[in-house]
């Protein structure tokens, strides 16, 4: 008998993957957590029925969250990741030698625990000496921080459950306060096919707080529609004006210095969402 997992991305559309076996399933304090082994994408982390990451395509999301803001900032030393308990963004952040400390605040400790167990190629960097892992509410951590971080990355689930507060204007204002005077922030902002209103709202809210606000995209096969967006807000540095000398060689599978600029070239229907 074949086993298949289907993520219903809308009421009428979804994606499905053949499952070899279930590695772990649990109702945590915050969400339903499933770790499964798939035929096509390797081990897959699922939260509340939504694919969070897979061994096969994880590098796209994690590289684009991390390297776009880190190469935009001239000297990022202190970095905060809100969410991201699978450890993929941390792994990419640590490729930048200027980063002296990376703090990860994940609300659900079970995500960290089982990512370490079943996604070691993604979560292995969580034990690095430059990393501080805190199990707690990222919203509250931001509220308690001021003029502390060079770059803040919000690696959250979609705006449901424990992540709902991470898509509010008040949260973005708190991020601005937590950043230093030339700080940069980035957040995943879902896809333009099924959630265009979210992109419009988030971009508008961020633009009212950050003088430089831009949208960029990446292609991620296991995320709804495959076309994913990220909103970046900066107090001083424009991601489209990064000097050539700032790029240094790091090992990546998706991100390149050419792609850095190309990612901001939006299809017209996506650009229309943020006019």
From Swiss-Prot:
Gene3D superfamilies: Spermidine synthase, tetramerisation domain, Vaccinia Virus protein VP39. Spermidine binds at residues 62, 86, 155-158. One of its GO terms (molecular function) is spermidine synthase activity. GO terms for cellular component: cytosol. It catalyses: S-adenosyl 3-(methylsulfanyl)propylamine + putrescine = S-methyl-5'-thioadenosine + spermidine + H(+). Keywords: Cytoplasm, Polyamine biosynthesis, Spermidine biosynthesis, Transferase. S-methyl-5'-thioadenosine binds at residues 31, 106, 137-138, 162. Pfam families: Spermine_synt_N (PF17284), Spermine_synth (PF01564). Residues 2-235 form the PABS domain. Its main location: cytoplasm. GO terms for biological process: spermidine biosynthetic process. Its EC number is 2.5.1.16. The keyword Cytoplasm applies. The active site is at 155 (proton acceptor). It is found in: Cytoplasm. Pathway: Amine and polyamine biosynthesis; spermidine biosynthesis; spermidine from putrescine: step 1/1. Belongs to the spermidine/spermine synthase family. Homodimer or homotetramer. Catalyzes the irreversible transfer of a propylamine group from the amino donor S-adenosylmethioninamine (decarboxy-AdoMet) to putrescine (1,4-diaminobutane) to yield spermidine. This is Polyamine aminopropyltransferase 1. It comes from Bacillus cereus (strain ATCC 14579 / DSM 31 / CCUG 7414 / JCM 2152 / NBRC 15305 / NCIMB 9373 / NCTC 2599 / NRRL B-3711). The gene is speE1.
């Amino acid at each position: 008998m074949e086993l298949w997992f289907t993520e219903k991305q809308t009421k009428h559309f979804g994606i499905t993957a053949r499952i070899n076996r279930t590695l772990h399933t649990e109702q945590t304090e915050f969400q339903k957590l499933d770790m499964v082994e798939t035929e096509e994408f390797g081990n897959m982390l699922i939260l509340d029925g939504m694919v969070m990451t897979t061994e096969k395509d994880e590098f796209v999301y994690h590289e684009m969250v991390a390297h776009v803001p880190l190469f935009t900032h001239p000297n990022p030393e202190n970095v905060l990741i809100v969410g991201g308990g699978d450890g993929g963004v941390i792994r990419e952040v640590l490729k930048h030698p200027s980063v002296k400390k990376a703090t990860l605040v994940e609300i659900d400790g079970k995500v960290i625990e089982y990512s370490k167990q079943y996604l070691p190629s993604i979560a292995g960097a969580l034990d690095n000496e430059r990393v501080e892992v805190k199990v707690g509410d990222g919203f509250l951590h931001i509220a308690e921080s001021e003029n502390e971080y060079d770059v803040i990355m919000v690696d959250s689930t979609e705006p449901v459950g424990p992540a709902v507060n991470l898509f509010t204007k008040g949260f973005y204002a708190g991020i601005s306060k937590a950043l230093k005077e030339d700080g940069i922030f980035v957040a995943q902002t879902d896809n333009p096919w099924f959630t265009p209103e979210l992109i419009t709202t988030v971009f508008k809210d961020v633009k009212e707080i950050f003088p430089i606000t831009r949208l960029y995209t990446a292609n991620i096969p296991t995320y709804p529609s495959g076309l994913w967006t990220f909103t970046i807000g900066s107090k001083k540095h424009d991601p489209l004006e990064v000097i050539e000398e700032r790029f240094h060689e790091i090992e990546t599978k998706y991100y390149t210095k050419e792609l850095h600029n190309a990612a901001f070239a939006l299809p017209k229907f996506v650009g229309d969402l943020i006019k």
